[in-house]
Amino acid sequence: MADDSNSAYPRVDYGAGTGAAFPDLERRVLEAWAADDTFRASIENRSGAAEFVFYDGPPFANGLPHYGHLLTGYVKDVIPRFQTMRGKRVDRRFGWDCHGLPAEIEAEKQLGITDKSQIDAMGLAEFNAACKSSVLRYTGEWRDYVTRQARWVDFDNDYKTLDLDFMESVMWAFKSLYDKGLIYQGFRVLPYSWYEQTPLSNQETRLDDAYKMRQDPAVTVDMVLSVPGEHPLRELDGANALIWTTTPWTLPSNLAIAVHPDVRYVHLRAADGTRYVLAAERVSHYSREFGEDATVLAEFEGAALVGLSYRPPFDFFLGHPNAHRVLAADYVTTDSGTGVVHMAPAFGEEDMEVCSANDIELVQPLDPGGRFTSMVPPYEGLMVFDANPVIIKDLKAAGKLLRHETIEHSYPHSWRSGQPLIYMAVPSWFVAVTKFRDRMVELNKQITWVPEHIRDGQFGKWLEGARDWNISRNRYWGSPIPVWVSDDPAYPRVDVYGSLEELERDFGVRPTDLHRPAIDQLTRPNPDDPTGRSMMRRVPEVLDCWFESGSMPYAQVHYPFENKEWFDSHFPGDFIVEYNGQTRGWFYTLHVLATALFDSPAFKTVAAHGIVLGDDGLKMSKSKGNYPDVNEVFDRDGSDAMRWFLMSSPILRGGNLIVTERGIREGVSHALRPLWNAWTFLQLYASKPGEWRTDSTHVLDRYILAKLAQTRDGMTEALEVYDIAGACEELRTFADALTNWYVRRSRSRFWSEDRDAVDTLHTVLEVATRLAAPLLPLISEVIWRGLTGGRSVHLADWPAAADLPADPELVSTMDEVRTVCSTVLSLRKAKNLRVRLPLAEVTIAAPDAERLAPYADIVADEVNVKKVDLTTDVAVHGRFELAVNARAAGPRLGKDVQRVIKAVKAGDWTESADGVVSAAGITLLPEEYTQRLVAAEPESTAALPGNAGLVVLDSVVTEELEAEGWARDLVRELQETRKSLGLDVSDRIHVVLEVPEARRSWAQTHRDLIAGEILATSLEFGTAGEPAAELAGGVRASVRKA
């Protein structure tokens, strides 16, 4: 053909040309989808079909999306696209997480609020209005971002956790749990955010970045023992029990000290005469303080100390009932500290349990903001961390401080504000997870985890140790805890509500807003109070926002008030995906609530991917600039390139991924460019449209069709088990075979417009773009529509196995041919023998070499040799070497492993016909050794991958071979000259060559080769007219169109 205008393609033109940049093409596709409403059509096309239920975890919309959202979003698009093409209906409702601390923190920033008291002064209505306006601040940016990544979601039918219907379903869930006896109010020590003035759940302290390195003071403090005269250890009277703590601020609240009953303790006299009591194992740790002349006076078990009294370091709570005694506690260790533990039950869970068991009620000298109250006058108003240095100073002044040091340790922080937490006893509402924990473990066995090890590992272990879940937050913006209690303890009553109808029944009004303060205004007289004076008032707490996101499967459809039949038949969901940290977050809360409410898993399959890291291997940071800007990548390389980079990576198998610009660009070369090049090649040479055909008898056509059939099966199998990276590898391997083998080796057939070749490539591209559609949705759309003229590849069906002829034997053999050629070409490169220089011979030595006989001509042409010699006698050209893996073999063979190693080094080993290896009379297992095929002449020989055989290259260059190589080099230069003159690849030309005397005979000998390759109708040797191209070696060429 003369030019692109004669081409049969594209049938649908995006107006960008074959040389367009991928980002430009992508934008045109996105515009076409929007105009055509293609996404909606993909749903409607499957009306009445079996449904694939996908849960889209709701992000917070008051922050901008990042790489983590991008990665997860691509997975959330690949699987639904694939399932849609497989004939399923896949609704994809987008959701928004609207409640909780993220919204409140954003509102506080906007309003200039730095303290909770300012919210009370402002009024809850105004503050929550600000929260509501902030939560959907970035929905427009999210929509643009999601659209640009070519992710199809339903924004118009989205769900929001602040919607009345959603909140009513959450209320129903709470009431259902309460009715099952799985909700209770308790007073427990919990992770507490003094900054946000609310407790957190234990799983929230296990989220990524919850623990950070922090420096804190550590003090060793004296507590003087008081021992009655009749006690067996009366000599301890006046001795100092030593405690060690990293929270000096808890010392004013000390109510007990604890020892381990079975640990050995000592009474010693320091060099200065002061007497101390501590664990024997910890004495050496304080040798500097005790002095060289310290003397152990007595040694005894901790049990002997139990019951003794002592004087606390501060006297704020002297006389507290049953306090200031030595208690026994099995959790006391001697790994650090002194082996004597200071106990402030308001600030330690284990402290609280032990003190409670010994009838010691806690004292709470902190306000909700973590500041000391008037119960400890010297420190009143000080925040706990600010109080540390003041307390330490007072201890030192009182002579009670033995040691003061600074330690750096991993410490929990609020996952939202980033402020360090404290542990504090607070009243909270709990889901009694421990009552059904074993059932959660059982139901987890029904879930398919990707990667599989998370099921019994990270998630399974977490379930086994699951604790009751604190679901209440002392905050403002969230779903209310639907509990009303009497305001007079003389007439106690508790009412729990599970629907708007129930609220309307008791309060006479149907709420239109369940948020505070509107819901708090619902009050009524206490029916159990005959005086009529007490009122039923709602408890002030709101629900943990994780309770809401864990409720999304049913709350998004307003279950059980609507869509009950639909939900019952579509639960559990088929698939969810998030990063693996959600084993402590969304995955966990979904599983807890589904188990408790429905005795079922919430999902059948879950993919838990790794973390995206910056190009330095560290967490992505704007300030460090250690990652490429997403929008810049979209503009430079395109969304498909980014999608390929992320989807083909180990991150989808649980590993982490370092994002680099180079890695993203490799996605272009690995997948996009090969498919695009094959498509532009077809456009260039097909003057008539190709047809769907799979009956060509040409070996290359048969091979590529069979290779495609194999790829179809491999990709189908991979995507069915959510192995997206595996599907990418299948497609990458095929794209390489298509462009670097089939198209390149078929060029001459296309030049003559061989219909078998055109039809085969048309068919291959039509199927390949359907296979690539979920992984490369934008470029696949351009190619498929240009090829077929159809509406969208995403409305097409996934290729069926019966569509393509399978021939695994041909694929295997041809792939071996390709491997042989690649090995020979690598050998040529190592010896600096350019491919255009013909060589005499290559020998292929392999046990199955004869199967390559029908393809010897292909090998010869590909590697440019005159002859291909096939032999099964590998031993002539090389030998196998064995290496023993001592680490693997040692546990089984014991001392014999050295005897085996010695025998192998001496060459005393054998391999039977069925592949069993023995050495020194001992059979080795496959994992206990490695074999390597070693060439007898390494300079001219290379081993095939997998020790499959050897290739031996005759590298002797005769003058005849050199002459032909020179001619082929000349052809390449003349082709470049044609190109520089703007000639079409099919244009015929007249050429005059001016060749130096030394090379004239070579030119004459290879006249036909030169003329044929450059499409010269006439080729003359003489003086080249002007203008003439200056070529290598003094050759000049005059070229004009025939």
From Swiss-Prot:
Descriptive protein name = Isoleucine--tRNA ligase
> Is ATP-binding set as a keyword in this record?
yes
Q: Which PANTHER family match?
A: ISOLEUCINE--TRNA LIGASE, CYTOPLASMIC (PTHR42780:SF1), SOLEUCYL-TRNA SYNTHETASE (PTHR42780)
Described by its record, this protein's role is as follows: Catalyzes the attachment of isoleucine to tRNA(Ile). As IleRS can inadvertently accommodate and process structurally similar amino acids such as valine, to avoid such errors it has two additional distinct tRNA(Ile)-dependent editing activities. One activity is designated as 'pretransfer' editing and involves the hydrolysis of activated Val-AMP. The other activity is designated 'posttransfer' editing and involves deacylation of mischarged Val-tRNA(Ile).
Q: Where is this motif: 'KMSKS' region?
A: 619-623
Q: What are the entry keywords?
A: Aminoacyl-tRNA synthetase, ATP-binding, Cytoplasm, Ligase, Metal-binding, Nucleotide-binding, Protein biosynthesis, Zinc
SUPFAM superfamilies for this protein: Anticodon-binding domain of a subclass of class I aminoacyl-tRNA synthetases (SSF47323), Nucleotidylyl transferase (SSF52374), ValRS/IleRS/LeuRS editing domain (SSF50677)
Location in or out of the cell: Cytoplasm
- Entry's EC annotation: 6.1.1.5
Q: What is known of its domains?
A: IleRS has two distinct active sites: one for aminoacylation and one for editing. The misactivated valine is translocated from the active site to the editing site, which sterically excludes the correctly activated isoleucine. The single editing site contains two valyl binding pockets, one specific for each substrate (Val-AMP or Val-tRNA(Ile)).
* Gene responsible for this protein: ileS
Q: Which family does it belong to?
A: Belongs to the class-I aminoacyl-tRNA synthetase family. IleS type 2 subfamily.
Tell me where the sequence motif 'HIGH' region sits in this chain.
Answer: 59-69
- GO MF terms on file? aminoacyl-tRNA deacylase activity; ATP binding; isoleucine-tRNA ligase activity; tRNA binding; zinc ion binding
Q: Which GO terms describe its cellular component?
A: cytoplasm
Assembly behavior: Monomer.
Q: Which organism is it from?
A: Nocardia farcinica (strain IFM 10152)
Q: What is its cofactor? A: Zn(2+)
- Catalytic reactions on record: tRNA(Ile) + L-isoleucine + ATP = L-isoleucyl-tRNA(Ile) + AMP + diphosphate
Which NCBIfam families does UniProt cross-reference here? ileS
Specify which residues bind ATP according to the UniProt entry for this protein.
Answer: 622
Q: Which HAMAP family match?
A: Ile_tRNA_synth_type2
Q: Is Cell inner membrane set as a keyword in this record?
A: no
- Pfam families found in the cross-reference section: Anticodon_1, DUF5915, tRNA-synt_1
- BP-aspect Gene Ontology terms: isoleucyl-tRNA aminoacylation
Query: Which stretch is the leader sequence?
Result: none
Q: Which superkingdom heads the taxonomic lineage of this protein's source? A: Bacteria
